[in-house]
Design a protein with these regions (language model features):
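Conserved strand-helix element at the start of the C-terminal RecA-like helicase core
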Residues: 49, 56, 347-369
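Conserved RecA-like P-loop NTPase helicase motor core
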Residues: 325-332, 379-469
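Conserved pre-motif I regulatory segment
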Residues: 1-26
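Walker A/P-loop
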Residues: 20-39
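A contiguous, basic/glycine-rich beta-loop/short-helix subdomain that forms a polymer-engagement track
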Residues: 128-148, 159-161, 227-319, 373-379, ...
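A substrate-engagement module of RecA-like helicase motors
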Residues: 47-149, 422
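Conserved interdomain hinge at the start of the Helicase C-terminal
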Residues: 322-357
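Signature of the SF2 helicase/ATPase Hel1-core->accessory helical subdomain module
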Residues: 57, 64, 133-149, 153-235, ...
Length: 486
């Protein structure tokens, strides 16, 4: 029989007290948040429950805890992983969402889904895929017909069905703007596609590309080149791309996402689209995370009840702040770059054979890649040694385990000043009073802690933390619940 620890039972009693309310639950990684919430849902009969996650790897952890409690759990996935047309190569994965919206009611797999019995006692979408060959149904839509206690799915997958409660895992992500990137040269693919349908509009995109290349770095304003009608026509072209596949279709989809973004920005040959966070909460909602700063409380509705389990002092990571370095835009000049290089080389020399994991923004890391033994590797070697450099907001910034002896945050990972300014104005129009914190401070702090967390997936892992930017001094109070400053 599964037994909860005394501290878990204490938190469980709070959940019973707050049943029916919106709840924020903050506890350290590895504490057992998932198990406690599932226990509370079971005892209160709050099933079916919808459990929202960022990555499928987290979903399997939820499934494991459901099994321990005797609960039925199902992990659902998006069209790219479940559509038979994608898996057979008939439709490119980049186009499947739009293809499905247009042809769904003519699709033989979709129609067959509602003509067969719904499978029972299955736990993941992978099991559904095994039956497609015999029954010819659509696993994507079959997922929504599955009866279970806990339905696990991605934040951004459409929410169908009735649920008594919504659980938002790693809820700090709702404060992070969504980003889409593409190389400036990728606009050539967009021009190629648009020229197939409208030569004049393709000419506008060509002029836009030349403008972006001239700007080099900074804000770009698409409305200077494209009218609202132009943008609408480009969006509609996505339904006409059946003959395009691979990188051409991928770049065109990215271009549309960038068009749909609130902010467009160009940096180092890449176009970045940023969409401001849509901070909304259905009721009742349970939000859980191991990354939360008190400054974030002000953005929660008053209806939320907060349950917090602090990181014990003996489990906080030792940290130092390097006072004579900064990546602040006005100060990050040739001289400062040389000082950072000296710092990295001295650290590497002093550390010897230890593993040094360095995180930084694209703008910063580009000057130091020659000092790295590994830079954004395709796969993380198990027994790596030396210096590994990873992008602070790259594919390895969250959701992976990278054991290290030292973690270096190479500069405060703020967004560029122009982006912060525009994001702040957007949040202000949404009605948020402290819009600057929402645009600048909170994303920077979350990114910092998430990078550190890649080397701290269990209480046994205790890397030393080096915050290589004097500006971190200003945020010591925010970080002190997680770090011990020497």
């Amino acid at each position: 029989m599964l037994r909860l620890r005394e501290t878990q039972l204490k938190v469980l009693r709070y959940f019973h007290k707050f049943v029916g309310n919106n709840v924020l639950f903050v506890a350290p990684t590895g504490w057992g948040k998932t198990l406690v919430i599932l226990s509370a849902l079971r005892e209160e009969g709050l099933f079916p429950a919808l459990w929202l996650i960022r990555s499928l790897s987290i979903g399997y952890r939820v499934l494991e805890d459901c099994v321990k409690l005797g609960l039925n759990c199902f992990i659902s996935a998006g069209r790219r992983r479940t559509c038979p047309l994608v898996l057979s190569g008939e439709v490119d994965e980049e186009l499947i969402e739009d293809y499905c919206r247009k042809y769904r009611f003519q699709c033989r797999y979709f129609i067959k889904t509602f003509q067969i019995k719904v499978p029972k006692n299955i736990s993941t979408y992978k099991i559904l895929l095994e039956g497609v060959g015999n029954e010819h149904f659509c696993p994507y839509y079959m997922q929504d017909l599955i009866s279970c206690d806990v339905m696990v799915q991605n934040y951004f997958r459409a929410r169908r069905g009735f649920y008594k409660v919504v659980v938002v895992d790693e809820c700090h992500n709702i404060f992070m703007p969504r980003m889409c990137r593409m190389d400036v040269d990728g606009l050539n693919d967009a021009i190629l596609i648009i020229r197939e349908f409208e030569e004049k509009l393709a000419g506008k995109i060509l002029r836009l590309k030349r403008y972006i290349e001239e700007v080099g770095e900074g804000n770009i304003y698409l409305t200077q080149f494209l009218s609202l009608l132009d943008i609408q026509r480009i969006r509609q072209m996505i339904f006409l791309l059946e003959n395009f596949k691979g990188s051409v279709a991928r770049n065109f989809k990215r271009f549309i996402r960038i068009i749909n973004s609130d902010i467009q920005y160009v940096e180092k040959g890449r176009i970045i689209g940023i969409r401001a966070s849509q901070i909304t909460f259905p009721t009742p909602t349970i939000m859980l995370t191991g990354t939360w700063f008190n400054i974030m409380d002000k953005f929660l509705p008053p209806s939320f009840k907060k349950i917090r389990v602090d990181v014990p002092e003996n489990q906080r990571l030792n940290a130092v702040i390097v006072d004579d370095l900064t990546t602040r835009y006005d100060d990050f000049d040739y001289k400062m770059i040389q000082e950072y290089k000296k710092f990295i080389m001295q650290l590497k020399l002093k550390a010897g054979d230890k593993r040094i994991l360095v995180f930084g923004t694209d703008r910063v890391l580009q000057y130091f890649t020659d000092l790295a033994d590994f830079y954004e590797p395709q796969n993380i070697p198990k027994d790596w040694r030396g210096v590994m450099m990873l992008k602070a907001r790259g594919r390895y910034s969250e959701g992976v385990d990278i054991p290290a002896d030292i973690v270096v945050i190479l500069g405060c990972p703020f967004y560029p000043p122009d982006i912060i300014s525009r994001l702040s104005k957007i949040y202000s129009k949404m009605g948020f009073e402290d819009s600057w914190s929402l645009a600048a401070t909170i994303p920077m702090l979350i990114t910092t802690l998430q990078c550190i967390g890649r080397a701290k997936r269990s209480p046994k892992q205790k890397p030393n933390i080096v915050l290589a930017d004097q500006r971190f001094q200003k945020y010591k109070d925010h970080l002190s619940p997680y770090l011990l400053f020497n």
